[in-house]
């Protein structure tokens, strides 16, 4: 079974980018509430 590196990279980016974006927004809101 051959692994499609481009599909794997696209999937990883599709998951990592929104997650890190939400994480940054959450940290900013949590720090401003202090």
Curated annotation (Swiss-Prot):
Signal peptide: none annotated. It is a single-pass membrane protein. The chain crosses the membrane at residues 5-25. InterPro entries: PSII_PsbM (IPR007826), PSII_PsbM_sf (IPR037269). Belongs to the PsbM family. PSII is composed of 1 copy each of membrane proteins PsbA, PsbB, PsbC, PsbD, PsbE, PsbF, PsbH, PsbI, PsbJ, PsbK, PsbL, PsbM, PsbT, PsbX, PsbY, PsbZ, Psb30/Ycf12, at least 3 peripheral proteins of the oxygen-evolving complex and a large number of cofactors. It forms dimeric complexes. This is Photosystem II reaction center protein M. It comes from Chlamydomonas reinhardtii (Chlamydomonas smithii).
């Amino acid at each position: 079974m051959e692994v499609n590196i481009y599909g794997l990279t696209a999937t990883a980016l599709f998951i990592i980018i929104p997650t890190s974006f939400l994480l940054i927004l959450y940290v900013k809101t949590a720090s401003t509430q202090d």
